[in-house]
């Protein structure tokens, strides 16, 4: 049977589901808090004016592209630390965590310089008002200063979650969300003696929140008794380039996968633009809701990475294979709920974004397509995270590149323009590309996990 799902009893299945839920739920809530921070930025910038909102939209797109790509690179720490934890290598867990912080700091500084360098070309490329371009530049400058803290935070995030302590990540994320509200209010509108920075104030608030999050996680880990045996904060460790090389080897393909997926969805918006504003608005509704729902398989997948890595560290290879299957089944059950939610409640969901009749009509149909691709999207996401637990990241990268850019964009363009399917041609191609990615990744996971079990039985 696929991934040996019939190997263990139903009680073992329920136990694994409970363990996955205990890890996934706090991670999901932490992501909700992070999305809430972006929502507050949008509301506050919109309150300052449409030009400020436009500046934040442009600046945040640049920041998000760098942040998401680098976040993928830092995700290499999850399987590394989880496997060491499962193997009982306490000292190596702490040392790998320290090297992760160093790596994150260097990567963040590189990201900061990259964003600085991008400001002038962005301004030269855009043909907007001086105010929008200037506010965007200020926003990018402030958020660039957040990059070192953001990557250190991701290192600590990976450390805590890989040691089965996602609750503290959730608490820090909600504290950051709460802090972001008054900071935005103060910096955007100029309260308590501060100058009114408009949309740029959102960038300053983002910088402050990321530095707070990194510092809060560090203090929490330093004070919490559970973490003391690992010694992350007990001593100072010099950068180890051998560990850096390992992080890069595992993480670079993950980062590129994130970039390929995010850029493909972003590029489709530009290809839809000739159909008119109503179609672009409807597309944004579909992508926004799909992005929110995508947090669910991401959380299940992250929990699966930790559980699989831990089991591999304990040399429980059959268990790791079984957990891969349980993760997928859990995702499929949740996907059914999301499909029904999108199909049955698509009208009220769309009306939350826009009340224009033309947009409502198009977006309601778009959500039907979005509902259809949920099972495939959940599957490909969780399967790629499971493979990450085995430290297999290059193959998923190639699969994502072929699926999203080869099977998604080009066929989508042909269906939209040559076969007159319009916006729905792109969504049809997305469903096909996600299905292809899901099948390929599950098959890869089946072969990888089976070979791991077989090779260690032969020893």
Curated annotation (Swiss-Prot):
One of the Pfam families matching this protein, by short name: MatE
GO cellular component term of the entry, any: plasma membrane
Regions that span the bilayer: 20-40, 53-73, 100-120, 132-152, 168-188, 202-222, 252-272, 285-305, 325-345, 358-378, 395-415, 423-443
CDD domains: MATE_NorM_like (cd13131)
Membrane-topology annotation of the record: Multi-pass membrane protein
Entry keyword set: Antiport, Cell inner membrane, Cell membrane, Ion transport, Membrane, Transmembrane, Transmembrane helix, Transport
Keyword Lyase: no
Family: Belongs to the multi antimicrobial extrusion (MATE) (TC 2.A.66.1) family.
NCBIfam families listed in its UniProt record: matE (TIGR00797), MATE_multi_NorM (NF000263)
Protein's name in the database: Probable multidrug resistance protein NorM
Natural source organism: Neisseria meningitidis serogroup A / serotype 4A (strain DSM 15465 / Z2491)
Upper lineage: Bacteria, Pseudomonadati, Pseudomonadota, Betaproteobacteria, Neisseriales
Gene: norM
């Amino acid at each position: 049977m696929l991934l040996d799902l019939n190997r263990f009893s139903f009680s073992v299945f329920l136990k694994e589901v409970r363990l996955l839920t205990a890890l996934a739920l706090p991670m999901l809530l932490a992501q909700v808090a992070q999305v809430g921070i972006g929502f507050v930025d949008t509301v506050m910038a919109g309150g300052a004016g449409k030009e400020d909102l436009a500046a934040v939209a442009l600046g945040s797109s640049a920041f998000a592209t760098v942040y998401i790509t680098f976040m993928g690179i830092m995700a290499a720490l999850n399987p590394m630390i989880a496997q060491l934890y499962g193997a009982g290598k306490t000292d190596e867990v702490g040392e790998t965590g320290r090297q992760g912080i160093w790596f994150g700091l260097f990567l963040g500084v590189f990201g900061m310089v990259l964003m600085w360098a991008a400001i002038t070309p962005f301004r030269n490329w855009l043909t907007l008002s001086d105010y929008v371009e200037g506010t965007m530049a200020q926003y990018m400058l402030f958020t660039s200063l957040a990059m070192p803290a953001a990557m250190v935070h991701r290192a600590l995030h990976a450390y805590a979650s890989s040691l089965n302590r996602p609750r503290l990540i959730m608490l820090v994320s909600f504290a950051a969300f709460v802090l972001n509200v008054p900071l935005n209010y103060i910096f955007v509108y100029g309260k308590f003696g501060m100058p009114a920075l408009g949309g740029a104030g959102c960038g300053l608030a983002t910088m402050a929140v990321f530095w707070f999050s990194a510092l809060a996680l560090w203090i929490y880990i330093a004070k919490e008794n559970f973490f003391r045996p690992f010694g992350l904060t007990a001593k100072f460790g010099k950068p180890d380039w051998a560990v850096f090389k390992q992080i890069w080897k595992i993480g670079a393909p993950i980062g590129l996968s994130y970039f390929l997926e995010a850029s493909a969805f972003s590029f489709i918006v530009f290809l839809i633009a000739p159909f008119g504003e109503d179609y672009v608005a409807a597309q944004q509704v579909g992508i926004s809701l799909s992005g929110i729902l995508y947090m669910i398989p991401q959380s299940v997948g992250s929990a699966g990475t930790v559980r699989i890595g831990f089991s591999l560290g304990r040399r429980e290879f059959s268990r790791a294979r079984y957990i891969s299957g349980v993760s997928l089944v859990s995702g499929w059950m949740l996907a059914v709920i999301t499909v029904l939610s999108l199909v049955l409640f698509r009208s009220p969901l769309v009306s939350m974004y826009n009340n224009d009749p033309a947009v409502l009509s198009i977006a309601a149909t778009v959500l039907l397509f979005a509902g259809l691709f949920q099972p495939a999207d959940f599957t490909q996401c969780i399967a790629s995270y499971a493979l990450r637990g085995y430290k297999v990241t290059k193959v998923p990268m190639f699969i994502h590149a072929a699926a999203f850019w080869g099977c998604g964009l080009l066929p989508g363009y042909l269906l939209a323009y040559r076969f007159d399917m319009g916006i729905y041609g792109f969504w049809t191609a997305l469903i096909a590309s996600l299905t292809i990615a899901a099948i390929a990744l599950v098959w890869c996971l089946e072969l990888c996990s089976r070979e791991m079990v077989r090779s260690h039985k032969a020893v």
